[in-house]
Structure formats: structure tokens, C-alpha cells
């Protein structure tokens, strides 16, 4: 697929944020990207020229924010709206090998959708959530740079990432990765054996450490995971806020987040 043929949809609704940064990151790589309201996929109230299909795109992104005010649970309402009208389309999209990225609130949406941890390759969306992103151990909103160690070689979103440790900022109150009580060891074994743990929080020496390096108390210091096919990726930190050098205090060039977006574009060019 030629780069100019690639189309990316950044899904939005009331309360999401960083859509513009995410769109700009993709566009800077020469692909077509747009922010698309969830209603554009199903509402008859939308003008014909603004109506969209999931299959108009080769990559979907669920951005950060506080969708629907994070009422009930973070990402729950956004997920419910997607599930009610797009479940079959999303499942087919994943089976086709097209990538989906969930950033912060978007990670929460993918968990609520049952897309992550995504152990079953034949059933991309579980019937109910198999993990959760709970309130931070600090019981408050955490907003600052974090250091992340790359753990996966198979996730398509980190194929171009050469550094062992990267810096992405976090901005969340509910980012603690938790698994069902009594199944933590089982889940960890499944994730590690299939190379599904993508990033873990570390300190300035590259060692796994607790708070404040792990900003939320996530199990096993997990910051991001992918599904069994390594094409659906969710993480709490924000790579789009570290895409350009000027976002992270550099005068020129790119930040560490550049490699996330470049990796998925390179993947799509090979399809």
C-alpha cells in the first residue's frame, strides 16, 4: 500500500482530547488522517458527505481524554456506544490485520470493548472485559513525564523503536492495570509468553521501580499491552505528546513518540 493511500481515523466524542495532536502526527508522515465523531459511523442525522465507515480506513485510533466525563468508569460509555453499533465491524477490522491504537482513555476504551488483552485470535473482542484500569494508588490525577522500557519485539507499533527506554508523558487518574483476582500469574504468563507486554514503567536507571516512577501502581509495572496478533495496542502514556522535539524541550527533530506512529505507517505500507 502506498503511503498516500493510507487513511487513519481518530475517533472522538464529547470529552476526548489530543485528537488534533494525533492527526497532525500522522499527517506529518504523509498519510491521510482525520478526527471522526462516533456519530459519523451510524447516525442518519449526519450529512451524507460526512458519513463514514470503519472500512474507509486502515488504522483506527481511540485518543486520550475523559470521554463522556468518565462517568460509570473511564471509557465505559464510549465503549458502549462503539460496541452497540460497530462491534462486528471492529472485529472484522482486526481480523483483516488492520491496526488499532488506544492512548490513555483510548486504552480504557479498548479494555472495556474486550479488545485487550485479546488472548483469542479467533474472537478479537471478548464478551466482557478481561482486565481493568483502576484508580491510581495515589488516588489522584498524575500528570508528568514517565520513562518506559520496551518489552515487545512483535508489537507492530514498536518495530521502529531502537531505544530501550523512552519518555512519554502521562495524564490520568485511572491507569492502574489490574487483572482478575487470583488470575494475575496466569495472565502474566500468557502475556509474557506471547510477547504482549509492550512497555513497563522504569526509573532513570532503567530499573523497574515503584511510585513515582510507576505513576499508578500498575501490576508488573505495565504501561501498555497489545493483543495476541500484536496489531491492537493500548497504553496509558501519550506518544502524541512526545512526537515533535519541541513538545519535549528539544529545538528540532522528533521526540520518542515519533517511532510509534512511524512503525504503524511502515506496517501499513507493507500490506
Swiss-Prot record:
Catalytic activity: N(2)-formyl-N(1)-(5-phospho-beta-D-ribosyl)glycinamide + L-glutamine + ATP + H2O = 2-formamido-N(1)-(5-O-phospho-beta-D-ribosyl)acetamidine + L-glutamate + ADP + phosphate + H(+); L-glutamine + H2O = L-glutamate + NH4(+)
An MF annotation (GO) of this entry: glutaminase activity
Entry keyword set: ATP-binding, Cytoplasm, Glutamine amidotransferase, Hydrolase, Ligase, Nucleotide-binding, Purine biosynthesis
E.C. numbers: 6.3.5.3, 3.5.1.2
GO BP field: 'de novo' IMP biosynthetic process
Active-site feature positions: 104 (nucleophile), 238, 240
Cysteines joined through disulfide linkages: none
Subunit structure: Part of the FGAM synthase complex composed of 1 PurL, 1 PurQ and 2 PurS subunits.
Protein name: Phosphoribosylformylglycinamidine synthase subunit PurQ
Lineage: Archaea, Methanobacteriati, Methanobacteriota, Archaeoglobi, Archaeoglobales
Gene transcribed to yield this protein: purQ
